[in-house]
């Protein structure tokens, strides 16, 4: 590649890097639902977010990478079973659960009490 072409593409690459870094992730739970999710820690390998689920709140559409969820208190809520029925989900304080990457939201929480969860996302 001629030197003048390399020099002319460098500003475009720098501009793309700056603009790309400034664009927020559209489905980042911390960005779309700061009243539910709070960032506790982040580096290049993991991100730790704290989730507070309250009865009657509707989670907006958001996405997670693979993660481990640690329940900071006992939690119970009803979930749709996909066949027109519901089943109760129960988690004990300190219980750790693997959750694969997913995009979800748009459902209203039906919890017995406020539920706090620490989510350790693998980046």
Regions flagged by a language model, labelled:
Residues 58-59, 75-79, 96:
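Short beta-strand segments in beta-sandwich/barrel cores
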